[in-house]
Amino acid sequence: MIFRISNFENDIVISNEYVRVLEIEDKALFINIVQGINSLCYNQDSEEYILLLDGDKELDLAKDSYFIFDVLNINFNDRKILNKLYSSIKSKVYLDDDIRQELESHYINIFNLIDSVLLELPFEFTYKPEVVVEDLLKLYGIKIINEGQSFMEKILYLVDLISLLDLCKVLIFCNIKSF
């Protein structure tokens, strides 16, 4: 993979075999690059021309990278992480027929119960006739616990989490060498 930034003469080659460190001494350039990467990782426009390439294919930074701006306050319950976690749980639920059938049975019972209550009210209602597993997980408030971890444990936990959930192809830390 290649990281191409307009203000740089050379491309940055990214490999699974080693960690790449990019040091930018010029503060104005540093700010522009960080803002550009951050914007692109959150599907916003950037003033900087920054590309992530896999061979000849241009990758979407918002989908294929994860940018950590503040390493001291890593949010393990970021929407991107939780959506991937919910998707992973959903896959496991649908792979096990017994769990899937039991869950569907509970859905039917809950809908019947809510229907009986709604019929007693003098209003007309509309609602989703089906609840997907992700909706149930969000309703249940499933979150990742990471309290009481040291700085290094949080970093390693994040790397493990990204690897297990196959969250992204490139993990980008800002100013991690400062710690």
Where are the regions a protein language model picked out?
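GG-anchored amphipathic helix commonly corresponding to the ABC/SMC/Rad50 NBD signature/C-loop
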Residues: 151-167
